[in-house]
Structures are given as structure tokens and as C-alpha cells.
């Protein structure tokens, strides 16, 4: 790519980009697209992709949760379902969430926001949305308030709330809105996302063997889908 220059007429108006795409998608793109010490090859299509894939996916995941939580009047008032009594799918995503907390905390402490943002993005798109919500959606449909359904609500709520806190240094406006919308009903926190304590990983919830087994299942599934597309079946 060429260096932006008024003389060459290839400069991008930042205010126009913010107006059209939003400041948080722009900030997320610039931070996750390249390391701070590397040159950034700016592409407006990349900002649009971040807005659609990451922020759009996170919004859709929250909207899915909010739809059924409102129907069932879920307010996180019930006692926590014990971790070891939750289904394996819940224990898997919570294990990944706590592994994510460790990785993101370490990245921020080492002034590596690029690594932090990429880890969060991968968790939201690949694991939380593509796998956890897709495999768990039927659990929210039933009319009865079972322990399994409560576990599903508590698990997804915890993931969304934690992601909003982890992401807030990079996307302060969007994540504060997400955090506020979540807590508007539950009242778990009375302040905004930027004043809460940063999450601390619960080592007892991290199960690397479970993460590896699920990762293998994801790879096998992706390979099978790829073969099906190849032979058009």
C-alpha cells in the first residue's frame, strides 16, 4: 500500500469514517489489524468487516439472549447452578472464558492490545456464537424453568457480561451500552463498565482436556462441512 497523503489524494477522512462506521469498529479494526509497531494498511472494507463480523455477531448473540430472557423473566436472582452440575457444553464455554480472561489480562499488562482484541474476537465469533449458542439454542425454547435452562441463561449471561468488560478498553462506547443493558435487568452492578473490577480467572473452571476435545470436534465438523461443500451435498 501507499502512504496516505493529501498530495496523492488518498487520505481517508477519519470523521467521515467515524460517522459512517462508528468510532468503536474503527478503533477495533486499527488495534486488531496490526501490531502497534507495524505499519497499518488501512482498508475501509476491513472496518466494515469488523463491524459486521464482530460487533454484529456480538449484537445478535445479545439479542438472542435478551429475547428469551425477557420471555422467561430471567433476572439472575436465582442461586448459581454449581459448576460441576452444569452440562458439559456450559463447562466448556466457561473454561474457554476463564482461559480468555487469563490471556487478555496478560496481553493488556504487556501492552499488547492487538493480541487481546484478536483473542476476544475469536472467542465471540468462533466459540460463543458459532458453537455454544447454536448447540444450546433449544435449551432456551422449553416452557418449563428447569435447572438446565437456568444454567444456560446464567452461562450465556456470564459470557456476555465478561466479554463486555474485557473489551471495554478497546470499544468503550459499545461495551458500556452492552454492559448497561445486561445490568439494567439484573442489577448485578450499579456502575458503568469502566468502573467495575477487571475479571479474574477462576482456575478451577479451566479444563484444558475438555477444551482440546471440543476443539477436535470443531475441526472434524469443519472438515466434514468443507467436504460437503466441495462435492455439493
What are these regions (language model features)?
Residues 2, 6-7, 29-31, 43, ...:
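Generic beta-strand/beta-sheet core signal
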Residues 72-102, 134-223, 231:
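Acidic, turn-prone loop/beta-hairpin segments
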Residues 31-33, 53-66, 87-100, 117-140, ...:
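Core structural elements
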Residues 98, 112, 120, 227-230:
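Long hydrophobic segments that form regular secondary structure
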Residues 108-115:
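Short helix-adjacent coil turns
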Residues 2-84, 186-189, 229-233:
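Catalytic adenosine-cofactor/nucleotide-binding cores of aminoacyl-tRNA synthetases and other
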Residues 46-52, 112, 148-156:
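Membrane-interfacial loop-to-helix junctions in multi-pass inner-membrane proteins
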Amino acid at each position: 500500500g501507499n502512504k496516505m497523503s493529501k498530495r496523492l489524494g488518498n487520505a481517508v477522512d477519519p470523521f467521515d469514517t467515524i460517522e459512517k462506521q462508528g468510532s468503536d469498529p474503527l478503533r477495533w479494526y486499527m488495534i486488531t489489524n496490526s501490531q502497534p509497531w507495524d505499519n497499518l494498511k488501512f482498508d475501509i472494507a476491513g472496518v466494515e468487516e469488523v463491524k459486521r463480523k464482530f460487533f454484529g455477531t456480538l449484537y445478535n448473540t445479545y439479542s438472542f439472549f435478551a429475547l428469551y430472557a425477557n420471555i422467561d423473566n430471567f433476572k439472575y436472582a436465582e442461586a448459581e447452578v454449581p459448576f460441576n452440575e452444569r452440562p458439559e457444553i456450559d463447562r466448556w464455554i466457561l473454561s474457554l472464558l476463564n482461559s480468555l480472561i487469563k490471556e487478555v489480562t496478560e496481553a493488556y499488562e504487556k501492552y499488547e492490545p492487538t493480541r487481546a482484541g484478536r483473542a476476544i474476537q475469536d472467542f465471540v465469533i468462533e466459540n460463543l456464537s458459532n458453537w455454544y449458542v447454536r448447540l444450546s439454542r433449544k435449551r432456551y425454547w422449553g416452557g418449563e424453568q428447569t435447572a438446565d435452562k437456568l444454567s444456560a441463561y446464567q452461562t450465556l449471561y456470564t459470557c456476555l457480561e465478561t466479554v463486555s468488560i474485557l473489551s471495554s478498553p478497546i470499544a468503550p462506547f459499545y461495551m458500556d451500552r452492552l454492559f448497561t443493558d445486561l445490568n439494567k435487568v439484573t442489577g448485578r452492578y450499579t456502575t458503568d463498565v469502566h468502573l467495575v473490577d477487571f475479571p479474574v480467572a477462576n482456575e478451577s473452571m479451566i479444563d484444558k482436556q475438555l477444551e482440546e476435545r471440543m476443539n477436535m470436534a470443531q475441526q472434524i465438523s469443519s472438515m466434514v462441512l468443507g467436504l460437503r461443500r466441495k462435492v455439493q451435498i
